[in-house]
Amino acid sequence: MGKRDQLKPKANVSSYIHFLLNYRNKFKEQQPNTYLGFKEFSRKCSEKWRSISKHEKAKYEALAKLDKARYQEEMMNYFGRRKKRRKRDPHAPRRPPSSFLLFCQDHYAQLKSENPSWSVVQVAKASGKMWSAKTDVDKQPYEQRAALLRAKYREELSVYRNQFNARKTCLQESATNQCREFEQAESDTTDGSN
């Protein structure tokens, strides 16, 4: 077991588990010489849990909430704050589909109409089997379409990057000019006050 695994926070437990631990301790105090097997003890606990009032259950639910908050806090410290995903630029060109995805797009409606009860996953698996069974000659039209779409994407991407770099340069220059103007205005006011 690694050092990091030893430091990992203990998982939070449910309200029922809090009740079970409390009930076990009380049972041991009241009947120290009595031994119950796991199955028997679990049955007794579940019967007792069903019989207690909502007010009593609320106490254990509060303990579970506190334990969950503790666990989340410790996990945040253990892993650190999660990094937010970088948002995708809506103006950036979208990546083109592969030859297999083009094949799937063409055959999805057909497979779905033949098998209306199939889920998306089942249709995708069937598409994968169909694609694997195809020969290289049969795959050629899809690969050509994918190559055309990739070439178009590369062109759009280079145009987008040029525009992005131009905007970035313009913003940097305008910020530099604003700084110069501010410094100039500041030096004019200090020179005028002397």
Curated annotation (Swiss-Prot):
Keyword Iron-sulfur found: no
DNA bind region: 9-79, 93-161
Localization annotation: Nucleus; Chromosome
Alphabetized SUPFAM superfamilies for the sequence: HMG-box (SSF47095)
GO biological-process terms attached to the record: regulation of transcription by RNA polymerase II
Pfam families, A to Z: HMG_box (PF00505), HMG_box_2 (PF09011)
Gene Ontology CC terms, in alphabetical order: chromosome; nucleus
CDD domains: HMG-box_HMGB_rpt1, HMG-box_HMGB_rpt2
Keywords in alphabetical order: Chromosome, DNA-binding, Nucleus, Repeat
InterPro entries referenced in this protein's UniProt entry, alphabetically: HMG_box_dom, HMG_box_dom_sf, HMGB
GO MF entry, a single one: DNA binding, bending
Family named by the database record: Belongs to the HMGB family.
PANTHER family on file: HIGH MOBILITY GROUP PROTEIN B4, HIGH MOBILITY GROUP PROTEIN DSP1
Stated name of the protein: High mobility group protein B4
